[in-house]
Design a protein with these regions (language model features):
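Phosphate-backbone binding and catalysis cores of DNA-processing enzymes
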Residues: 1-133
């Protein structure tokens, strides 16, 4: 099967909800539609040019407002978890992540911190002194 480059471009832009621009209806339902379509959106709380999830949603949801994600958090319709990287995920997908979250519980994180206590303290010290840092 041969697909023309232009057809492939149109397909990929539509599949990633980028064509036409901001074609997803505005509001909380539109934001949830993007989360459900993608499964997750990488989350980066540090805003160099803007927080990643806000940039992703702004490009796809008409009139996107960052406060909409806060509302979805409060309503427990999205949550943070690790999905290769820290990500925001629709709460409806929680059952798929539950086992992995359980495996990486408090003992898992305590063991990592114990093994890397010197480095962890150095990083925390810099954050206390300088504020948020990029990776």
């Amino acid at each position: 099967m041969k697909v023309a480059a232009e057809a492939a471009r149109r397909f990929l832009l539509a599949r990633h909800l980028l064509a036409p621009a901001r074609s997803v209806a505005g509001g909380l339902d539109g934001v949830l539609e993007v989360f459900r379509t993608f499964g997750s959106i990488q989350f980066d709380p540090i805003a160099v040019a803007g927080r990643n999830h806000d940039l992703v949603l702004h490009a796809r949801v008409a009139g996107y407002e960052p406060a909409w994600c806060d509302v979805l958090y409060e309503r427990r319709e999205i949550f943070e978890t690790t999905n290769k990287a820290l990500s925001l995920v629709p709460a409806s997908d929680f059952p798929w992540f539950r086992l992995g979250i359980g495996r990486k519980g408090p003992r898992f994180h305590a063991a990592i911190l114990a093994e890397n206590a010197v480095v962890a303290e150095r990083v925390l010290g810099r954050i206390r002194a300088e504020g948020a840092l990029s990776a």
